[in-house]
Amino acid sequence: MIKLEVCCYSVDCALTAERAGADRIELCASPSEGGLTPSYGSLRLARDRVSVPVHPIIRPRGGDFCYGAVDFDVIKHDIAQIRDMGFAGVVVGMLDEEGHIDLQRMREVMRLSGNMAVTFHRAFDMCQNPMVALSQLTQLGVARILTSGQQQNAELGLPLLRDLLQASQGPVIMAGAGVRLSNLHKFVDIGIQELHSSSGHAVPSTMRYRKAGVTMCSDSEFDEFSHYCVDGEMVEAMKNSLALVDPLVQSA
């Protein structure tokens, strides 16, 4: 069965995605930075209220994936907390200064993760040599790799995604970034078995009073009176589309 993981930036979004049929949730905070580690409150509510597997992201800051000693200490504490809370998996990744997998630190990550399934996130798309990285992550025991095929969106990355699928002897290759209803078939056609989508849209704030001339964001053009939410109807449509093509893939 082709699985759909939905990227969710709140517990409300995770519940919406679950109701719409998502197979798994990647739980994050801060959509404007591409996903950061969610708060303890979000983690606890997601654990208690969401029934499908939830894999929280571990990312202490935005920007690149080359971390200093303090950032790495934060990562280790977050992994231990998420493991002890009983989550099924975790999403993490780190590179060294030359854009290679930070093997020493990833070994520590794998040790700390215990029985959790580890997804190496889109730090993979910033690495110098994806085939070498695939081999290294395989040896580390990573369960899956979330990747756009090292392109701005996964549709542009289809050639590398195909090569990674053919080469992988362990990690699931999960396509993500710009995966939507209109292009699902392109990933299915090359044999992708797991897809990652935010399926998001902006929802206007319920606030009626809106203070003019003051923002909480450094980007004065950013609309702070809307919230990024999962579109449940879109998730449901994507799942229905995958259900139609999956039997054809299985019989091919």
From Swiss-Prot:
Q: GO MF terms on file? A: copper ion binding
Sorted alphabetically, the keyword list is: Cytoplasm
Which InterPro entries is this protein grouped with? CutC-like, CutC-like_dom_sf
The record's GO CC annotations read: cytoplasm
By its UniProt entry, which SUPFAM superfamilies does this protein fall under?
CutC-like
Domain of life of the organism encoding this protein = Bacteria
Q: Where in the cell is it found?
A: Cytoplasm
What Pfam families is this protein classified in? Answer: CutC (PF03932)
Does the record bear Cytoplasm in its keywords?
yes
What family does the database annotate? Belongs to the CutC family.
Q: Could you tell me what this protein is called?
A: PF03932 family protein CutC
What gene, per UniProt, encodes this protein?
Answer: cutC
